[in-house]
């Protein structure tokens, strides 16, 4: 069977895991195209398909061209037998799922990225950015901790795209920032995160848990 579509992105990309997880649940084969960031996305051929030059970007076997990770994840979530589970079985549930996706996009991922990029050598360290980003990430984790207390999943009683988006947004945070001492502060978040990435149907996408013991600090 031919792939459902192809994905353009550098790997690993924290915005891609939710896409591949949704595709895997729905039994959709996605081809990961060989890609060199800041080279391939600047070519005339790429810009003709995706004028903004952003990745991830999706090209469907039917010719659909779709940038923006949340849009791609939603499209793949809606394109198979798990669509109602992933996106909600009624309007209220769908809205709640969208609420949490927006939360991770605005309140988690940008601050996580600020904390990670200097630790992996992509950007120089800046103390002001570090302080603000850590405070914002811990605030978001506190919101999540309170919501997840007594809950198995973010919305309702089954895995949804909100959970896949959340786990994707926090994957690098657990690898580089949320160390053992932090994890003690947010036990419900940790339990939910592990439950999500260890779900049988998607665990190959996320890989085994990679939890940092002590986060790197600038000297």
Curated annotation (Swiss-Prot):
Keyword field contains Phosphoprotein: no
Domain GST N-terminal as annotated: residue spans: 3-84
Its EC number(s): 2.5.1.-
One GO biological process term: translational elongation
InterPro entries: EF-GSTs (IPR050802), Glutathione-S-Trfase_C-like (IPR010987), Glutathione-S-Trfase_C_sf (IPR036282), Glutathione_S-Trfase (IPR040079), Glutathione_S-Trfase_N (IPR004045), GST_C (IPR004046), Thioredoxin-like_sf (IPR036249)
A GO cellular-component term linked to this record: cytoplasm
Keyword Hydrolase found: no
Pfam families in alphabetical order: GST_C, GST_N
Entries under PANTHER family matching the protein: ELONGATION FACTOR 1-GAMMA, ELONGATION FACTOR EEF-1B GAMMA SUBUNIT, PUTATIVE (AFU_ORTHOLOGUE AFUA_1G17120)-RELATED
Protein name, as recorded: Glutathione S-transferase-like protein LUC7
């Amino acid at each position: 069977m031919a792939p459902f579509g192809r994905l353009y992105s550098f790997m690993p990309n924290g915005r891609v895991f939710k896409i591949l997880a949704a595709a895997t649940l729905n039994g959709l084969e996605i081809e990961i195209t060989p890609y060199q960031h800041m080279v391939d996305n600047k070519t005339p051929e790429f810009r003709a398909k995706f004028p903004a030059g952003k990745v991830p970007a999706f090209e469907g076997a039917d010719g659909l061209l779709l940038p923006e990770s949340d849009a791609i994840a939603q499209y793949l979530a809606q394109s198979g037998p798990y669509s109602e589970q992933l996106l909600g079985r009624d309007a209220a549930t769908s809205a709640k799922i969208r609420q949490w996706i927006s939360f991770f996009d605005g309140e988690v991922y940008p601050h996580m990225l600020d904390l990670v990029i200097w630790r992996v050598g992509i950007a120089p360290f800046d103390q002001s950015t570090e302080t603000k980003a850590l405070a914002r990430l811990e605030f978001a984790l506190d919101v999540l901790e309170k919501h997840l207390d007594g809950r198995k999943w973010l919305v309702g009683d089954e895995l949804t795209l909100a959970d896949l988006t959340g786990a994707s947004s926090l994957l690098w945070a657990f690898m580089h920032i949320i160390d053992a001492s932090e994890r003690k502060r947010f036990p419900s978040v940790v339990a939910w995160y592990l439950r999500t990435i260890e779900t049988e149907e998607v665990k190959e996408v996320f890989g085994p848990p990679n939890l940092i013991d002590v986060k790197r600090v600038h000297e």
